[in-house]
UniProtKB/Swiss-Prot annotation:
This protein's UniProt keywords: Cytoplasm, Fatty acid biosynthesis, Fatty acid metabolism, Lipid biosynthesis, Lipid metabolism, Phosphopantetheine, Phosphoprotein
Gene: acpP
Family per record: Belongs to the acyl carrier protein (ACP) family.
Name listed for the protein in its UniProt record: Acyl carrier protein
Domain Carrier positions: 4-79
Pathway(s) per entry: Lipid metabolism; fatty acid biosynthesis
GO terms for biological process, alphabetical: lipid A biosynthetic process
Major localisation: cytoplasm
GO terms for MF: acyl binding; acyl carrier activity; phosphopantetheine binding
Signal peptide range in chain numbering: none
SMART domains membership: PKS_PP (SM00823)
Organism: Synechococcus sp. (strain WH7803)
Amino acid sequence: MSQEAILEKVRSIVAEQLSVDAGEVKPESNFQNDLGADSLDTVELVMALEEAFDIEIPDEAAEGITTVGDAVKYIEDKQA
């Protein structure tokens, strides 16, 4: 899956999970600061990404995923 395809899928999931417009979801968007996610939202978002991409994101890795771009890079690395 290309980086662009991953970004589009992540953008769609983030927009749905956080009830924000997909246009607001940019690679540099921070889940908490820019998109208004709280800690529970973040956990649910990680679970949704795991399910959508059929990957496992350990807690240690999830703590380092703070932006949309971080999520895309992590998923891209897991699929390589």
